[in-house]
Amino acid sequence: MKSSAVLKGLQMSPQKARLVADLVRGQPVGKALEILRFTTKKAALPIRKCLESAIANAENNEGADVDALVVEQIMIDGGAVLKRFAARAKGRGSRILKRTSHITVVVAEVY
């Protein structure tokens, strides 16, 4: 059985969030939560909350055994990009891109 959770519009670069997502992909959920709890990256907290939501969805909606769940998929996709202006020398300006991410976590029960 598969269950998923989605977090959209996270104000963080997808490239930075993927560094944390790669740590927990394919891990049992208990180990994945421990890894995220002790990871010092900013992306660890929203990914952990999304994983906890996927675990709760599996437990409450599907009746899955939490100890048998594995992080089957974790995808970090790019969201909307906010374009901002930064003043530069000699009256010029440059563009700052404020990137956002969409996180999708899929947990599956292994037998």
From Swiss-Prot:
Pfam families: Ribosomal_L22 (PF00237). InterPro entries: Ribosomal_uL22, Ribosomal_uL22_bac/chlpt-type, Ribosomal_uL22_bac/org-type, Ribosomal_uL22_CS, Ribosomal_uL22_sf. One of its GO terms (cellular component) is cytosolic large ribosomal subunit. One of its GO terms (biological process) is translation. Keywords: Ribonucleoprotein, Ribosomal protein, RNA-binding, rRNA-binding. Signal peptide: none annotated. GO terms for molecular function: rRNA binding; structural constituent of ribosome. SUPFAM superfamilies: Ribosomal protein L22 (SSF54843). This protein binds specifically to 23S rRNA; its binding is stimulated by other ribosomal proteins, e.g. L4, L17, and L20. It is important during the early stages of 50S assembly. It makes multiple contacts with different domains of the 23S rRNA in the assembled 50S subunit and ribosome. Part of the 50S ribosomal subunit. Belongs to the universal ribosomal protein uL22 family. This is Large ribosomal subunit protein uL22. It comes from Acidithiobacillus ferrooxidans (strain ATCC 23270 / DSM 14882 / CIP 104768 / NCIMB 8455) (Ferrobacillus ferrooxidans (strain ATCC 23270)). The lineage of its organism: Bacteria, Pseudomonadati, Pseudomonadota, Acidithiobacillia, Acidithiobacillales.
